[in-house]
Amino acid sequence: MGVGEMNKEVIDKVIKFLMMVILMGTIVIWIMMPTSTYKEIWLTSMRAKLGKSIYYGRPGVNLLVYMFPMILLAFLGCIYLHLKKSTTVNQFNSGVEKKRAKFGALRRPMLVNGPLGIVTVTEVMFLTMFMALLLWSLANYMYRTFVNVTSESAATDGNNLWQARLDLIAVRIGIVGNICLAFLFYPVARGSSLLAAVGLTSESSIKYHIWLGHLVMIIFTSHGLCYFIYWISKNQLVSKMLEWDRTAVSNLAGEIALVAGLMMWVTTYPKIRRRLFEVFFYSHYLYIVFMLFFVFHVGISHALIPLPGFYIFLVDRFLRFLQSRNNVKLVSARVLPCDTVELNFSKNPMLMYSPTSTMFVNIPSISKLQWHPFTIISSSKLEPETLSVMIKSQGKWSTKLYDMLSSSSSDQINRLAVSVEGPYGPSSTDFLRHESLVMVSGGSGITPFISIVRDLFYMSSTHKCKIPKMTLICAFKNSSDLSMLDLILPTSGLTTDMASFVDIQIKAFVTREEKTSVKESTHNRNIIKTRHFKPNVSDQPISPILGPNSWLCLAAILSSSFMIFIVIIAIITRYHIHPIDQNSEKYTWAYKSLIYLVSISITVVTTSTAAMLWNKKKYYAKNDQYVDNLSPVIIESSPQQLISQSTDIHYGERPNLNKLLVGLKGSSVGILVCGPKKMRQKVAKICSFGSAENLHFESISFSW
């Protein structure tokens, strides 16, 4: 190990230590927040020292205690991921082996058939701890409510005892809801360093957003109902509902936020989400209304508690917006006989992504507003100039695309305008640690495994490392779906040498058809039309929005935007808010909240735009020209012959997963599954058996 690598390892350990300290400190704050010790001692002391500042006033306490640590944590996460990105394959896998040996059991499925879906031991542990935090907070608040509120104290406010307690219970429930809201946006920040630093992807984290979303709406709805009952008992329902206090909680703003939240919540019902995806998709833009009026409701001082996650989400969302403004070069499309198309885009060689990554695609000629996620089937290492996605016709949007490209008039289409966001995926993968890799798919669930196979083909010849034996178990409804197997290898980039290092076996099952003749099956698979396009000069190769050092650039955006934000707030507070307010909370809450939100928006927009333009000027003009001049490498026959010779097709039956998976030999067998819910549950159940200690389960799901 060289001096540079040793220094990098030391820096890596220091960053991990700092991140752990910040995380533990934040957890302690959340645990102590509902206690009297926090309110009467800690908070009082902090407000005495910071709350009277002429530069920040009362919001300065929450700005320092809640917002600053999370922005710093995200910043350190970016630095950690940048260092990790340059780790060699052998270094990475040696480290992974040690970690997996210790914590492999925590990744095993624990809950399989339940409302939460497939949940691992680790997820159950963290879910239990989070629910314990909510119950701890609620219990502390309720105890203080029932102890401190007496008949005498209630009478001074003109309330009965039950009314006074109901009033405080409603407040406490709302405060507990803020805990859930504080974590709500982290899982949907697709390019977040916080997700990548702990090995999570945006797709795998969606379920956490769903869980938190349900909790947020259950708690906030209960909060609102308690107040409605209280106001009705006081004969003040209408007047209180329309009340917008200048220097206190705004009831009307809270109701608007709640209605926006309820509209989003209703559309998440599975039948509505699947059958009326457009309704679900468009209604979720109400998150802007929800968060805006939530801040107006509670005031900026209290809103800073759950705001860090939203801040990180805003940075990510605006970067995605900048990327989506460009049309990308769609080079060609392959139309398969199974109502499936493969779109091939030109890619900047500096854009690197891991297998199983996803990309969001927008085609304005089909829908100007709809964005749909698709798994990337190409390998950024094997195909440095091309990025490919496979799209199965399963909804209105994808059906329109297939009809457009498969119709007889498709020859008249010279260009298709496409915009993309992404790719998004794991910061690294650890498939090489396994002795063998078993991939189980159903239908279009084969797509993430195509990218894995291609990546391992490349690594087998270039890194000269041992590649796990691969077994692909794929189930299809019809024989025409077998044409998806022809996409396992790309049309260019492979050489004969690569095939000699790979051991792969494919077991394909056609469930709805009996055995057909070899001639008919081959005929169905060979009907693949290729459509070439002529992109405009303005169309660009898909490129990383923040350049080759994207994590460093994101760290710069997070740090600079936050520093500029606190400087702007300090100036405005010192020369505008403080002369009026004098730390007496007399300044209108809505105006102060608006100042903070506008300042955040301005800093995020300016720093993100500046970073994007700087990277575009420095890297892309030169590399775009390079991409256009690259000549394709035609695939040799041996790799394709290997796939054909390794494929075993079974007609009229489903894969017997118990027979195929139970008793697999080897100290480490990776089991990956992507397909229908029942298939994923079946595989998870097999891997959860006590006798399956050598099976390491991972589920890849398209369904939210």
Swiss-Prot record:
Single biological process term from Gene Ontology: monoatomic ion transport
Q: Which residues bind heme?
A: 209, 223, 284, 297
Alphabetized, the UniProt keywords read: Electron transport, FAD, Flavoprotein, Heme, Ion transport, Iron, Membrane, Metal-binding, NAD, Oxidoreductase, Transmembrane, Transmembrane helix, Transport
Tell me which cofactor or cofactors this protein depends on: FAD
Principal localization? membrane
**Annotated disulfide bonds:** none
Q: Which reaction does it catalyse?
A: 2 a Fe(II)-siderophore + NAD(+) + H(+) = 2 a Fe(III)-siderophore + NADH
- Similarity section: Belongs to the ferric reductase (FRE) family.
Q: What does this protein do?
A: Ferric chelate reductase involved in iron reduction in roots. May participate in the transport of electrons to a Fe(3+) ion via FAD and heme intermediates.
Protein known as: Probable ferric reduction oxidase 1
What organism, scientifically named, is this protein from?
Answer: Arabidopsis thaliana (Mouse-ear cress)
Its lineage reads: Eukaryota, Viridiplantae, Streptophyta, Embryophyta, Tracheophyta
